[in-house]
Swiss-Prot record:
The gene coding this protein: cdiA
Keyword Cell cycle among record annotations: no
Catalytic residues, chain numbering: 1195, 1220, 1234, 1266
Annotated source species: Burkholderia pseudomallei (Pseudomonas pseudomallei)
Renumbered residue ranges of the record's region C-terminal effector domain (CT), has tRNA nuclease activity: 1147-1307
Family: Belongs to the CdiA toxin family.
Lineage start: Bacteria, Pseudomonadati, Pseudomonadota, Betaproteobacteria, Burkholderiales
Sequence segments annotated as region (Probable inner membrane translocation domain): 996-1193
Protein name stated in the entry: tRNA nuclease CdiA
Enzyme's top EC category: hydrolase
Length: 1307
């Protein structure tokens, strides 16, 4: 027994007693003292350590009675009572903690570490028996452990608080170092709060009574058996204690080398709070409050019945965890660095990133009974927010107003990034360098597209990369082989100075509604009684669920079952710009260049996602409202539904919505100027996307099972995209309402993403580029990108219905809709539509695909053009070889192939169409764009000739071939658009520019093809002449000697037989002659395919159609070999006048021996051309005739023959000259030649023959003029009919002898 008038101080005392009767007149102190020591180590580290001294213990083996006139102070002290405890504290009873820890500072060579680590030791009360504790003031326990073995009562006139003790530990550190070329500095700060809650335990019923408030904060009341009863005159607060964690860091790193340096700076600031909720657990729990009961982020649970009764409000809500984070990162490089690909830079680059994020997360409360009932009564409002009420049996909530709704989680994220780069860059230039650079960039782009799941763009980038590798390789090989000239590839080194900047900002804000739930194994009943105020007595359940066997919602006024809404808002923007100027030096000399580009974009999206309320009863759901009942964004599901609505019944579905929009645009251009030429280019892109979605995800309605529905509504029943349904027999369904209105909800989904762009460019002289419109020397164009269009539209209807059953309209005079038209099928009512895709990502992928398609389009068109050029060259070479060996059928076939592979040819166009289909399909993503690409490419290739005409016409008008070429490209683009849309326009432009416009050999090859065709026609006609006897009229019959191809006997004037093509002599028939006025007979003509003609005179001749047939390869001998006939024609006599000798080809002499012109003779010189034309000479001479601006293959062939027989070398006379050719070497050096009668085609020859007699006088006048101006005037008479030849010879005989001496007749 201890009785004092003053204080009893048991600080760090150890008191033991069998029983205790302590009466302190003032304070009772049961503290454990602390002690602090200070230490300094050898290395200078300091330590201040606080520890507990001897523990303060008051140990009573039996019963204890403690009475104080003042406070009972207990800090880390221990009260242990083996029996019963009877305490009467006159003041406050404070059960606190003592804080211990160590503050340590360590100084190192590279920095300082400052740590302060703390912990708390709480007080304890352990009672083996029953407890009867009365406190005249407040009872406050922080971080304490209280164990009331057999329960009892704890009562205070003031507040009773079971709370958490808090300690904070901090770490502060900094370090730095410098190693010459490397340095760093870093600082770190961390502060962590630790909470130690109070724990109250007991073995039997414990009563906690307060004259004011009861607070259980971050603490636990846990009874093994018995009930936990909390009764307060004020509030009862069961809540969470919040601990805070802070982390801050700063770092800088730098590295410097001989040629480069790097600096990195980063920071991180993070703060988070964590709510530690409370727990009250016992067999049964009863909480009573004279004011409010607040359960926040905590759990109140009993094995049996749990009851909460408050005179005012009961709030069962959430606690919240929060976080805020901010990071920065800056990186700066200076000096030598990679410039991308095979280039390097010297300069500065900077990267700055900032990220911010924050969040609020709700922690639900749970109040309930495991196998008993849960009863919650509030005099005013029962509010369940983001929390759960649960009972194994019944849940009953009664209040003036009841709100069961959701708590809102929020997240915010924001990112910013800025980059800049400036300095000098050294890289490859020239066409080969450009191809290499683009191959690298396209390869990287293909990888990025694949990462972005853009397979089409990845494939197109890969095609472009492969093409760039191939073009670069071909160009490099050509350079190694010593290629020269305007079309030769180039390579060089470029040094440029420039800068670039980019920025990006994005943010996303989300709200997520965490609904409440009420779950009962038996009945769930919510009753809103109202408090006598009008419009009071409401039940509102928002975005939450009620589940029970039977659910009853009874409201004095309204029952509101409504949805909640999640939101998601995103915003983004970006911009970039750059410019550079440079100087290059390479195989094309010295050049300068400049470029600039700019881009910007933005995107926004707002989404709303609805969360329906659900009332689920396995048996019966009952709704009774004195006013309206609103089932909006909610569902009532039960086996049987009973509703008695004193106002209106409104049932409506709500739609999820998404509205999004994005924009992106870019533009750029540049120019290059070198010693060999220059070029300029410009490109632009623009994209817009938008999406709009509104759709009912979950239809609202009242759904009954086999029990049916019995709904009575005093006012109007309105269904908006909603239903009252049942699976029961119609006899169990009844709707009685004043009036009934219904309507449907239209759902829709629309999105559209469109991207368009173009590139334009031109070059003069020799281009130094490998990619883009300015890469084609001396040309240019405008190439549209393959238009990107992704869109979708869907619509559907959410219908209203009432299942079959009785519908009773109690106010028929007010009914406006015909109930007979009501939809009675309450199944499959919700027509859904798909949500819109991410339009901003779609826009980004479209831009990528457009760029990839443009790059690949050039590769494919240009590659096919190169392939076709090669095929054309191969066919020309094969045609020449066939001519050399006399195989005219094969020659014609190869000429046809060369034409087919030429610009405008079918083979080239077919292959371009295939390439167009590939690029159009991949670029546009559909069969239609593939068809469009094929149509545009094929049409552009087929109409290459028309484009050339446009180019020449515009070029002539403007005086600029470049303008003409651009006009041709624009025309091709328009034509492609007409036949193939966007893909057609893009591919048509590509084909015109990179195929037809990039074909430097086409003019020469076309001349060669035309010349070969002319040679073929001439040779075939000569073969026809030999077979048909056309020679007879020009050479005396006595001089004709024909070499039979198979070596058979000769036919001569002494042997009046004649020869057919099978090598056999035919018997002479009466009336048939061989002479100047007749041709060979029927067998010969039949062999020509001319039918069974009798002997005919020269006036009939062989028609132009016959010659055309010969020229097309129809002329064959009996064995099918045209070459034999041709060889026979070649072996005709040649010479001067009428005394020709046998061809050298038949006598073993060198073919092509020279003869001398008449040189003053009074008669024309006659040449019988028998040898094939020398193709090398023909190619040299077949150039544009400046007088007419065209190729003249007829003149070229005749000139080659003239060289062969007269010797020397001819060349085209310069523009303005009145003659065709001039000898530049040989015996006639310096003399001029002016040809006549040298048709280029069989059709021209036929026309000459048709009108020769009528135009003879004009012809002879022209002949006289030519003979007066030129030294030689060759006349190719081989294409004239016999009658016209006779007229020509007679007319020449009438000319002055001086002029006749200049004439050379070619036969």
């Amino acid at each position: 027994s201890l009785d004092t008038t003053g204080n009893v101080d048991l600080t760090s005392a150890n008191v033991k007693a069998g029983s205790l009767d302590l009466n302190a007149g003032n304070k009772l102190i049961l503290d454990t003292a602390t002690q602090t020591t200070h230490q300094v180590s050898r290395d200078g580290a300091t330590s201040d350590k606080t520890t507990l001294g001897p523990a303060a213990n008051l140990n009573v083996a039996g019963d204890a009675s403690i009475k104080t006139g003042g406070d009972f102070q207990q800090n880390a002290g221990n009260l242990n009572v083996g029996g019963n405890l009877n305490a009467n504290i006159g003041g406050n009873w404070n059960l606190g903690v003592q804080q211990t820890g160590e503050h340590k500072v360590v100084q190192r060579a590279n920095g300082v570490s400052d740590t302060d680590l703390n912990s708390a030791t709480g007080s304890t009360v352990n009672v083996g028996g029953k407890s009867a504790i009365g406190v005249g003031g407040d009872l406050t326990a922080q971080g304490a452990r209280l164990d009331f073995g057999q329960g009892g009562t704890v009562a205070a006139k003031g507040n009773v608080t079971f709370g958490a003790a808090s300690t904070t530990s901090t770490i502060n550190a900094n370090s730095s170092g410098d190693q010459g070329n490397r340095s760093y500095a870093e600082t770190r700060h961390g502060a962590d709060q630790a909470l130690t809650g109070t724990t109250v335990k007991g073995g039997d019923t414990l009563n906690v009574v307060s004259g004011k408030d009861i607070n259980v904060i971050g603490s636990t009341i846990d009874l093994k058996k018995g009930d936990a009863n909390l009764l307060a005159a004020g509030d009862v607060n069961v809540g969470a204690a919040t601990e805070t964690h802070v982390y801050n860091s700063r770092e800088t790193h730098s590295r410097s080398g001989v040629v480069s340096g790097t600096k990195i700076a980063s920071s991180q600031d993070a703060t988070s709070t964590v709510a530690n909720g409370s727990l009250i657990s016992a067999d049964g729990v009863s909480i009573g409050s004279g004011k409010d009961i607040n359960v926040q982020g905590s759990t109140v649970v009993g094995t049996h019945d749990v009851a909460l009764n408050a005179a005012h409000d009961v709030n069962i809500t959430t606690s919240q965890d929060t976080s805020q984070s901010s990071t920065t990162y800056q990186e700066q490089h200076s000096g030598l660095m990679s410039g991308g690909g095979l280039s390097f830079s010297v300069g500065n680059s900077k990267l700055a990133q900032q990220n911010q994020s924050s969040s609020v997360t709700n922690n639900a409360s749970t109040v309930g009974s495991v196998d008993g009932n849960l009863t919650v009564n509030a005099g005013n409002t029962l509010h369940v927010k983001g929390s759960d009420l649960v009972a194994g049996k019944d849940v009953t909530g009664t209040a003036a107003n009841i709100v069961v709704d959701s708590a809102t989680d929020t997240t915010h994220q924001a990112q910013q990034q800025q980059t800049s780069k400036s300095g000098l860059t050294v890289g490859l230039s020239g066409s080969v360098g450009d191809a290499i650079n683009n191959a690298i960039s396209e390869t990287q782009a293909a990888r990025e597209s694949a990462k972005d799941s853009n397979g089409r763009a990845s494939a197109l980038h890969s095609i472009a990369a492969a093409g760039d590798v191939a073009f670069g390789g071909l160009g490099a090989k050509a350079l190694l082989d010593g290629a020269k000239g305007p079309q030769a590839p180039s390579i060089g080194v470029q040094v440029s100075v420039g800068s670039s900047h980019s920025s990006m900002q994005s943010s996303e804000d989300q709200t997520i509604q965490r609904g409440s739930s009420i779950n009962a194994g038996g009945n769930a009943k919510l009753i809103a009684t109202g408090n006598g105020t009008p419009k009071d007595g409401n039940i509102t359940i928002a975005g939450s669920n009620v589940n029970a066997a039977n659910v009853a919602l009874v409201a004095n006024n309204q029952v509101n079952l409504v949805n909640t809404t999640d939101t998601d808002k995103t915003q983004s923007s970006n911009s970039s710009s750059g410019s550079s100027v440079g100087v290059s030096i390479g195989t094309n000399g010295i050049g300068v260049s400049a470029s600039m580009q700019r881009a910007h974009g933005d995107g926004n999206s707002d989404a709303a996602i609805q969360n329906n309320t659900h009332i689920n009863a396995s048996q019966t759901a009952t709704i009774v409202s004195g006013g309206d009942t609103n089932v909006i964004g909610a569902n009532v599901n039960a086996n049987k539904v009973v509703a008695d609505v004193g106002g209106n019944l409104n049932v409506a579905s709500v739609q999820d919505t998404t509205v999004s929009a994005a924009h992106q645009s870019s533009a750029g251009g540049g120019f290059t100027i070198s010693q060999t030429g220059g070029g300029a280019s410009f490109s632009a892109q623009n994209g817009h996307a938008d999406g709009n979605y509104a759709g009912v995800k979950e239809q609202a309605g009242i759904q009954a099972g086999s029990g049916g529905f019995d709904v009575t509504v005093k006012g109007n029943t309105d269904l908006k995209g909603a239903y009252i349904g049942s699976t029961a027999d119609a006899s169990k369904n009844s709707l009685t309402t004043g009036t009934l209105t219904t309507s449907d909800i239209e759902n829709h989904s629309h999105y559209s993403a469109n991207s368009a762009g173009f590139s334009a460019g031109a070059s003069v002289g020799v281009s130094t580029k490998a990619v883009g419109p300015s890469s084609v020397s001396g040309s240019g164009g405008v190439t549209p990108m393959v238009f990107q269009n992704d869109s979708g539209d869907q619509s559907a209807t959410t219908k209203s219905a009432v299942s079959v059953g009785a519908i009773n309209i109690t106010k028929p005079g007010e009914q406006t809709q015909d109930v007979a038209n009501l939809n009675r099928d309450a199944t499959n009512l919700n027509g859904t539509v798909s949500k819109t895709p991410d339009v901003q990502k779609m826009l980004s992928q479209q831009a990528d695909t457009m760029n990839a398609a443009q790059a690949a389009g050039q590769t494919v068109s240009q590659g096919i053009g190169l392939y076709a050029d090669g095929k054309r060259k191969d066919a020309i070479d094969a045609a020449k070889a066939a001519y050399e060996r006399g195989d005219l059928v094969a020659m014609q076939s190869y000429i046809d192939q060369a034409k087919s592979w030429d610009e405008g040819g079918a083979s080239r166009a077919g292959l371009q169409a295939t390439g167009g289909a590939l690029i159009g399909g991949l670029g546009g993503g559909s069969v239609l764009t593939a068809i469009g690409g094929a149509a545009g490419a094929g049409t552009s290739s087929l109409l290459a000739g028309q484009a050339e005409k446009i180019s020449k016409s515009v070029g002539d008008m403007t005086g600029s071939s470049l303008v003409g070429n651009i006009a041709a490209n624009v025309a091709a683009t328009v034509g492609g658009a007409l036949v193939g849309g966007s893909a057609g326009a893009a591919m048509a432009s590509n084909v015109e520019l990179y195929n037809a416009g990039n074909d430097p050999q086409k003019t020469d090859d076309r001349a060669t093809i035309a010349g070969l065709q002319g040679l073929l026609s001439r040779t075939a006609a000569m073969a026809s002449d030999a077979k048909a006897g056309v020679w007879n009229g020009m050479v005396n019959v006595a001089g004709v000697i024909v070499n039979i191809p198979n070596g058979g006997p000769f036919a001569s004037p002494g042997d009046p037989g004649y020869v057919s093509l099978d090598g056999l002599k035919k018997p002479y028939k009466s009336g048939t002659s061989i002479g100047p006025d007749t041709e060979f007979l029927t067998p010969i003509l039949a062999t020509l395919g001319l039918g069974g003609k009798a002997a005919v005179g020269t006036d009939a001749g062989i028609t132009s159609a016959d010659v055309a047939t010969v020229g097309n390869g129809a002329l064959k001998n009996a064995s099918g070999d045209l070459s034999a006939a041709a060889n026979s024609a070649r072996n005709q006599p040649y010479g001067q006048g009428a005394s020709a000798s046998q061809s050298p080809g038949t006598q073993g002499a060198s073919s092509g021996s020279n003869i001398s012109a008449s040189n003053g003779s009074s008669s024309p010189t006659t040449i019988v051309a028998s040898n094939p034309v020398d193709l090398n000479a023909f190619d040299r001479l077949n150039v544009v005739d400046p007088a007419v601006g065209k190729f003249r293959p007829g003149e070229a062939g005749a000139a080659a023959e003239l060289e062969n027989y007269l010797g020397g070398t001819l060349q085209r006379a310069p523009q303005g000259s009145s003659v065709d050719f001039v000898f530049s070497s040989g015996p006639n050096n310096g003399k001029t030649v002016d040809f006549m009668l040298t048709p280029d085609t069989v059709a021209q020859a036929a026309k000459i023959n048709q009108f020769f007699d009528k135009n003879l006088n004009n012809f002879m006048n022209t002949l006289s003029d030519h003979a007066a101006a030129a030294d030689f005037v060759p006349l190719d008479s081989r294409f004239l009919s016999e009658a016209n030849k006779t007229l020509l010879v007679k007319a020449i005989g009438n000319l002055p002898q001086k002029l006749q001496a200049k004439i050379i007749l070619i036969k």
